[in-house]
Curated annotation (Swiss-Prot):
Keywords: Ribonucleoprotein, Ribosomal protein. HAMAP family: Ribosomal_bL35. One of its GO terms (molecular function) is structural constituent of ribosome. One of its GO terms (cellular component) is cytosolic large ribosomal subunit. Belongs to the bacterial ribosomal protein bL35 family. One of its GO terms (biological process) is translation. This is Large ribosomal subunit protein bL35.
Length: 68
């Protein structure tokens, strides 16, 4: 019998993506880890919270998080 290797989920991506009930992928915004003082208040406010993954990236990300 041939042993099939299980595909593993990308562990780095698992920590950064949340899946909703309707299978949408939520991610955090980029550009907010440091240097916030040089950005405007509006920029910092708009970078808070989460946003949905774009459709062009959805299929690529979905293959990386198979097990979830």
């Amino acid at each position: 019998m041939i042993k099939v290797i299980k595909k593993k989920s990308h562990s780095g991506l698992k920590k950064r993506i949340k899946i909703t009930k309707k299978k949408k992928l939520l991610r955090g915004h980029a550009y907010k880890n440091h240097l916030a003082a040089s950005k405007t208040t509006k920029q910092n406010r708009q970078l808070r919270g989460v946003t949905c993954v774009k459709l062009c990236d959805y299929n690529r990300i979905k293959t990386l998080i198979r097990g979830l």
